[in-house]
């Protein structure tokens, strides 16, 4: 294995971190080199995570009507996207929604609410939900995503049983003001630091396709490495109608795979999660992306529908991976026979052919 990307993997496995120049080389690799990039990044993935895939499940506790003006977001101030809008779910409804995801194979549930950040009453609501969740499902990991944190709130969440806190930096600091003006990049970093200071595992990632340059994608990833993010969700812009980014299509499936591979090279021992937008941007390369990423969201997202959960589990199994924490049970569930479909169209019939 003398290809440059395998040499880079060798160096990283030996303890030499990737440089920004290395990251740019991965991102700018020719499409003809894609499988070499994937194979090299896959060595890092398997060295740290074996053949497991961590499955996460989102529960949108409060949807829409956010006062922040993030240009990419269907829930943001000024968005006309025709999404579901509702106030806080009840504790019982939260338990019901969480149970569905856990039965589907998720080991981590992500409790998300729209808004700038939680009030004291909001923290009260969420901590009550988390205590009930932990009692009902003792082994579940809980990640909260409630916006910008105030002093002491991370500790309250930790004390209630929250394991991690998600707050994405979304893009490079040099691109931040182009996508949101109601809070600063420093505000986002401060919340990640507050989460860490409160004993929560930091979960912070990015969104690709926001008009950023290659250099800004690299800048964002190295910022996440510097922040010490344990879990890095890599989202791909979903250009909702009614938002400033509607009709924005800057990504190809091969570029998305390279972005994920770049994340693996830069942060080899961190959870790299294929997050929002994977279905519309990776398309038929979703399974290839699993060779470098080790985590996915199951089912639907906050305001958009995702791939069928059964298809997600089949994709994991078909690629030789197992769901973290549910290796045996889910492997058997996914092994349902598929009978051949008898042709009833095209030649020899009056039915339009499949062409």
Curated annotation (Swiss-Prot):
Which catalysed reactions does the entry list for this protein?
A: (4R,5S)-dethiobiotin + (sulfur carrier)-SH + 2 reduced [2Fe-2S]-[ferredoxin] + 2 S-adenosyl-L-methionine = (sulfur carrier)-H + biotin + 2 5'-deoxyadenosine + 2 L-methionine + 2 oxidized [2Fe-2S]-[ferredoxin]
Q: In Gene Ontology terms, what is a biological process of this protein?
A: biotin biosynthetic process
GO terms of molecular function: 2 iron, 2 sulfur cluster binding; 4 iron, 4 sulfur cluster binding; biotin synthase activity; iron ion binding
Cystine pairs annotated here are: none
The Radical SAM core domain extends over: 51-275
Query: Where does the chain bind [4Fe-4S] cluster?
Result: 66, 70, 73
Which keywords has UniProt assigned to this entry? Answer: 2Fe-2S, 4Fe-4S, Biotin biosynthesis, Iron, Iron-sulfur, Metal-binding, S-adenosyl-L-methionine, Transferase
- List its EC numbers: 2.8.1.6
Identify which cofactors the protein needs according to its UniProt entry. [4Fe-4S] cluster; [2Fe-2S] cluster
Q: How does it assemble?
A: Homodimer.
Q: Sum up the protein's function in the record's words.
A: Catalyzes the conversion of dethiobiotin (DTB) to biotin by the insertion of a sulfur atom into dethiobiotin via a radical-based mechanism.
State the NCBIfam families in the record: bioB
**What name has this protein been given in UniProt?**
Biotin synthase
The source organism is Saccharopolyspora erythraea (strain ATCC 11635 / DSM 40517 / JCM 4748 / NBRC 13426 / NCIMB 8594 / NRRL 2338)
């Amino acid at each position: 294995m003398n290809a440059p990307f395998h040499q880079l993997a060798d160096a990283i496995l030996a303890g030499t971190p990737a440089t920004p120049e290395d990251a740019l080389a991965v991102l700018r690799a020719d499409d003809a080199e894609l499988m070499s990039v994937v194979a090299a990044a896959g060595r890092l993935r398997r060295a740290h995570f074996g053949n497991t895939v961590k499955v996460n499940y989102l529960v949108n506790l409060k949807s829409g009507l956010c006062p922040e003006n993030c240009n990419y977001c269907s829930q943001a101030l000024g968005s006309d996207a025709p999404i579901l809008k509702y106030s806080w779910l009840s504790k019982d409804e939260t338990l019901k929604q969480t149970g569905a995801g856990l039965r589907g194979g998720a080991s981590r549930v992500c409790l998300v609410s729209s808004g700038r950040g939680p009030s004291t009453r909001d923290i009260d609501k969420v901590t009550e939900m988390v205590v009930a969740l932990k009692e009902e499902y003792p082994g579940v990991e809980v990640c909260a995503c409630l916006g910008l944190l105030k002093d002491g709130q991370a500790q309250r969440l930790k004390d209630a049983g929250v394991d991690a806190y998600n707050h994405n930096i979304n893009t490079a600091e040099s691109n931040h003001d182009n996508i949101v003006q109601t809070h600063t990049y420093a505000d986002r970093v401060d919340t990640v630091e507050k989460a860490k200071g409160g004993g929560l595992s930091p979960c912070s990632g990015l969104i690709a396709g926001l008009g950023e340059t290659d250099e800004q994608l690299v800048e964002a990833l190295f910022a996440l490495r510097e922040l010490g993010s344990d879990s890095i969700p890599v989202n791909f812009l979903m250009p909702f109608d009614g938002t400033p980014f509607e009709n924005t299509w800057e990504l190809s499936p091969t570029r998305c795979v390279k972005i994920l591979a770049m994340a693996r090279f830069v942060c080899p021992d961190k959870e790299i999660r294929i997050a929002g937008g994977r279905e519309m941007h990776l398309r038929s390369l979703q399974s290839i992306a699993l060779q470098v990423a080790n985590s996915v969201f199951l089912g639907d997202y906050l305001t958009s529908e995702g791939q069928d959960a059964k298809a997600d589990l089949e994709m994991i199994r078909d690629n030789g991976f197992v769901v973290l924490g549910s290796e045996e049970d889910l492997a058997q569930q996914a092994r349902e026979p598929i009978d051949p479909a008898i042709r009833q169209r095209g030649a020899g019939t009056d039915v339009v052919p499949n062409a």
